[in-house]
Amino acid sequence: MQKSYLLNTIGFLFSLLFCLPSFAAQTEAPLPDTFAEHKIVLQISDSDPFKQTLVLNVAGNLQRYYGADNVDIEVVAFGPGVRLMFDGNTNSQRINTLMDSGIRFSACQNTINHMAKKLGYTPKIQKNVGIVPAGAGRILQLNAAGWQILKP
């Protein structure tokens, strides 16, 4: 009886060992394919309109400074910063213009879920904004892949 229990336990542990990496891979957003010399992730976690405008200014300024072909930029929003990416936000047109120039925008699914509970409805996120499982996790994922983090 003990031998059977031990074998089942070992089998279960080995199955976990091989399954967990596939579960972890499913929770992370894929890394962008980039050959840019500079890779920058901008964090916005504040609902202050001044800081939200600042992060958009920095994104555009960095792209102009390095040149669109030489820099890859992703703006990641979590916490109150997700409001920047709400559909109909006063910066929606500006975000569209920056996206058209190649800058990516990502919003935190955890924050959206939390806001939905508080608001009683799921807030609509601007079209073409990527949704990532966790905004802070996305920033760390990009940093581990060599991206520089800026929090203007």
For each of these PLM feature ranges, what is it?
Residues 3, 21-23:
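A subset of signal/propeptide-processing and intrinsically disordered low-complexity segments
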Residues 1-10:
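Bacterial N-terminal signal peptides that target proteins for export
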Residues 5, 17, 27-30:
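Hydrophobic alpha-helical segments with strong N-terminal bias
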